[in-house]
């Protein structure tokens, strides 16, 4: 596939430096705005915590110069003032601890609330996406939006952002405090800081590139795992285990390499910063001691004075409080960049265009009154198309199942048609079968009828109404679909049947199961209709899963049925059981059948043979056999269906 080739080419490229989209930050702030009051509380608590941290460093200078040094000179020292100062400092510490607890707890609530809202938005938007999106994106990659990308956001919101803000506030507060103590030593730290920032920029810049690459690789690995799990039977049938493992090993190695490189850069940052902090600590002690011994005038925000022992000790403590937040900022920036990469992917999903629907004709319950159709609220078993007109009037057209395609062209890609000039007319109650090799366009036609895709040219009419005028939900509600690949959901058998009509009663579900010949095996399950299915109905045979799928389509009692290769994966005995139920289900309905087994379409009213997106033959079984064309060759085995 083209996207696979593109993926492989991308894998071999050196990752480029990520560009942070300002719009991503703006949209994240939009989610934060809902918690405005709590965010203000968090900011206040972070300020209190940072101030408490700085005051503890300043207290050392006061403790040494104002209390300890004078007490050392007294013959009978009185410690009352020292004890009061220590109690005051203890109170400040308690305030700092409480502030830290409150902002961490509050940020946990905010972050989880935001993530819930983002997941809700993603899931709600995903329901509006066209089938084309899921045909062009691996399920594993879509799933990674809900797992890896949201987890990266969680870490940023609950940990990185608060720590980033706290570190920035601490840096500013400590810097002001250092100016309060000594201008000369502050200037020395600033000079040393330029060297530190150069190291941080080099390491953080490289790690951010590989953190972005890591997120991309995680999506690739998840997508491949999901693909192999779903196709595990095919893998084993064709003995493809070693090849699958080789491909996975390659993708996993690429993930390992990007994670190793990213974390190597990220993990060496703190040790390097710690050692540079130790070097600064020693140098400050030397500079401060030299200034004090030389009697250099100490200049600060409070004026000029002498360099005291308390000032030097306090400055040494502050150097740690200054360097550590800088290291934390650089480290948290990596987490923020990775989270923004995840957020960008999330917003790309949210920005995907929803399925367009400009229809205005709706499907309503109806009844006849004085020979005319009128809308009613109660279920009558009679449905009608409610058609509003520009002059304000309403007309009602009975839902019959009359389907017409006129000169229809279609292509999944622009200027690359896969269907050419398709014309068909299915009268209510007719059974129309499509026959042809894989890729001939059989399934594509049914996808156009229920508007999973829109045609490039021509018209499709449903009961005389152009289907572009019918709301998609109502159009699809009027059709029953049975696919070869059955999807069952976690829940009871009854719930899975009711999926076809959410307001169906238990009696209606059981009647649908009987019609599909599924009632017998369902009652033999441990809890009958209340048996809980898990893992896509993994405990059921393929035939049983297919029967439940047919019952699910039958419960809605639609006038049009689409059977997309519905019995091609069932054994002959089960097919006979299914076919008996299907014959009853198809009675009086317009039915479109796609099957590889020609025996299932032999009794169709019209059989259409497709080749390369064109209808090359049409007619009933007897007519096509008499013509001795492509259908005859397929039926007699001269050619095989693919």
Regions found by a protein language model. Name each.
Residues 14-21, 44-45, 52-65, 92-139, ...:
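Juxtamembrane helix-loop junctions of ABC transporter transmembrane domains
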Residues 2, 39-102, 179-184, 286, ...:
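Transmembrane helix-loop-helix hairpins at lipid-water interfaces of multipass membrane proteins
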Residues 75, 366-642:
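ABC-type nucleotide-binding domain
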Residues 131-132, 148-157, 161, 165, ...:
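An intracellular "coupling" helix at the cytosolic face of ABC transporter transmembrane type-1 domains
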Residues 1-53, 68-85, 103-107, 111, ...:
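Membrane-integrated ABC transporters
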Residues 177-191, 261, 265-344, 349-353, ...:
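Helix-loop-helix
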């Amino acid at each position: 596939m083209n996207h696979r080739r593109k993926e492989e080419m991308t894998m071999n490229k050196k990752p480029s430096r990520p560009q942070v989209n300002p719009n991503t930050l703006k949209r994240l702030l939009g989610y934060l705005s809902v918690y405005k009051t709590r965010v203000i509380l968090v900011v206040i608590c972070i300020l209190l915590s940072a101030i408490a941290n700085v005051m503890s460093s300043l207290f050392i200078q006061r403790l040494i110069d104002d209390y300890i040094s004078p007490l050392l000179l007294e013959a009978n020292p009185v410690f009352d003032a020292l004890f009061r100062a220590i109690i005051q400092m203890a109170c400040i510490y308690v305030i700092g601890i409480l502030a830290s607890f409150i902002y961490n707890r509050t940020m946990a609530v905010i972050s989880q609330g935001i993530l819930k809202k983002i997941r809700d938005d993603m899931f709600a938007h995903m329901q509006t996406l066209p089938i084309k999106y899921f045909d062009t994106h691996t399920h594993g990659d879509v799933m990674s939006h809900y797992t890896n990308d949201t987890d990266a956001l969680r870490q940023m919101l609950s940990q990185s952002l608060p720590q980033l803000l706290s570190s920035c506030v601490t840096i500013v507060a400590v810097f002001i405090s250092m100016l309060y103590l000594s201008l000369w030593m502050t200037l020395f730290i600033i000079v040393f800081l330029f060297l530190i920032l150069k190291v941080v920029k080099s390491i953080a810049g490289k790690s951010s590139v590989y953190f972005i690459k890591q997120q991309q690789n995680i999506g690739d690995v998840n997508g491949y795992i999901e693909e192999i799990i779903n196709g595990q039977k095919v893998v084993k049938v064709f003995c493809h285990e070693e090849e699958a493992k080789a491909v996975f090993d390659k993708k996993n190695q690429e993930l390992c390499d990007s994670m190793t490189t990213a974390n190597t850069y990220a993990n060496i940052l703190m040790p390097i910063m710690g050692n540079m902090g130790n070097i600064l600590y020693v140098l400050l002690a030397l500079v401060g001691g030299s200034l004090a011994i030389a009697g250099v005038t100490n200049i600060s925000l409070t004026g000029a004075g002498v360099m005291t022992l308390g000032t030097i000790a306090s400055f040494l403590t502050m150097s740690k409080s200054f360097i550590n937040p800088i290291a934390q900022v650089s480290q948290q920036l990596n987490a923020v960049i990775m989270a923004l990469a995840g957020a960008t992917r999330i917003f790309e999903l949210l920005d995907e265009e929803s399925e367009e629907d400009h229809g205005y004709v709706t499907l309503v319950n109806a009844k006849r009154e004085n020979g005319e159709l009128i809308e009613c609220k109660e279920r009558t078993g009679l449905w009608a198309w409610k058609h509003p007109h520009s002059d304000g009037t309403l007309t009602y057209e009975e839902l019959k199942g009359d389907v017409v395609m006129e000169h229809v062209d279609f292509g999944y890609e622009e200027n690359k048609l896969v269907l050419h000039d398709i014309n068909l007319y299915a009268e209510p109650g007719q059974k129309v079968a499509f026959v042809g090799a894989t890729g001939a366009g059989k399934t594509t036609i049914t996808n156009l009828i229920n508007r999973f895709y829109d045609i490039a040219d021509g018209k499709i009419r449903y009961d005389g109404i152009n289907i572009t005028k019918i709301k998609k939900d109502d159009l699809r509600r009027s059709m029953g679909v049975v696919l070869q690949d059955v999807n069952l959901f976690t829940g009871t058998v009854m719930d899975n049947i009711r999926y076809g009509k959410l307001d169906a009663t238990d009696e209606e579900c059981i009647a649908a199961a009987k019609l599909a010949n599924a009632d017998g095996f369902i009652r033999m399950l441990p809890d009958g209709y209340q048996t809980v299915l898990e893992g896509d109905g993994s405990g059921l045979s393929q035939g049983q899963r297919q029967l439940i799928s047919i019952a699910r389509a039958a419960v809605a009692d639609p006038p049009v049925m689409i059977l997309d290769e519905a019995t091609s994966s069932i054994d002959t005995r089960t097919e006979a059981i299914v076919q008996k139920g299907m014959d009853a289900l198809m009675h009086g309905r317009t039915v479109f059948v796609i099957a590889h087994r020609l025996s299932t379409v032999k009794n169709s009213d019209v059989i259409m043979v497709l080749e390369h997106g064109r209808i090359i033959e049409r007619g009933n079984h007897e007519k096509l056999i008499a013509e001795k064309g492509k259908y005859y060759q397929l039926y007699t085995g001269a050619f095989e269906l693919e």
